[in-house]
Amino acid sequence: RINQIEHGAETVSAGEMLTTQLIEHYGYEPQISMEDGLIILVKYLQHTDEVFIFDNTYLGKLKKVQEILLGYLLEIDRICRKYDIRYFLAGGTLLGAIRHHGFIPWDDDADVMMLREDYDRFMQVVQEELPENIFVQVPETEKGNHNPFTKLRINDTMFATEFTGHFMDMHNGIFFDVLAHDQTGNHRWSQKLHLMFTMLSRSIVFNKWGNTDIKSGGNHPVICRIVDHVKYLIPMPFAEWAQKKALTFFQNRNTDYLYDGMGRNLKRGAFPKSWLMETVYVDFEGYKFPVPKEYDQYLTWLYGDYMQMIPVSARRTSHSIVLTDLGAYGNYKI
């Protein structure tokens, strides 16, 4: 309820209920629904660190971050074309390509994916092909980094997340991710075992890295508690070796399924390898980029009804960025 709003000759009475219809009556056009506005208000009061996206964020820098990422996506595309390496837009970047023909308006990174054999070939040439201002961040190039996938970081920028902000000796520049989809078993039981060992090895590495506890929920709480107690006895090099072995366990086997062993969708399990065997090109921010020909099946597997827009109250960046500095890229143009 409101005390009083004056608008021209009309005055809203004290105590009158403020509604979307009343706002429109006085000539104002709401940018979001009243319901979304209330949800955002409640979430803001409960979680003041969350950023909700309408047009821009990061102090007006999100659009510029996306433009910078686009420039280096074009570099990846150039390298992959030169060496005939097959790759696809991935995750939210793929969803943005299909639904928005560009970045999702509230997305703050870019992702590409490859099959393992293409990923390994890409890693052999990427450092010599990329401009000098790009750092290839893998455990082999930076001692403090323990991600199972590759991050390409832009030098002389800052884009530190709530997690990586605790490791300021690491490169924390603007980043985009390069991930491999590895093979998994043909049978449900082998897929489940593969998934379990991958999750355990990744949990050990991540929680040793962040000095945090392994969550004991889920389907295997006893195993999680045991592993949490012994993880301190496992040297990090051995934990990373075990993680790599888990990811590539089926690499030289003839299987028909893949899984997202490196990424966020590990728990979704296996999907048919055939979905990533053919490529088509779609518009993305005015350029053509490759996506899986079976993108509909792949995106449905990831997101369900992926063309359905999420509520405004849920539109927020996927990373909790705590430090942002575009450096010399503040005026970047492709």
Where are these regions (language model features)?
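Active-site nucleotide-donor binding segment shared across nucleotidyl transfer reactions
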Residues: D77-A110, Y119-D120, S274, W301-L302
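Conserved SAM-binding loop
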Residues: F122-Q124
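Short glycine/proline-rich turn/loop motifs
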Residues: Q21-L22, E50-G60
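A short secondary-structure junction signal
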Residues: R188-H194
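Short aromatic/basic micro-patch
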Residues: E16-M17, Q31, M113, P290
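Conserved catalytic core of two-metal-ion nucleotidyltransferases
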Residues: T57-Y83, V126-N186, S203-L302, M309-I334
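Amphipathic terminal alpha-helices
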Residues: M34-D49
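C-terminal "lid/loop" region of Rossmann-like NAD(P)-dependent oxidoreductases
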Residues: R1-A14, T19-T20
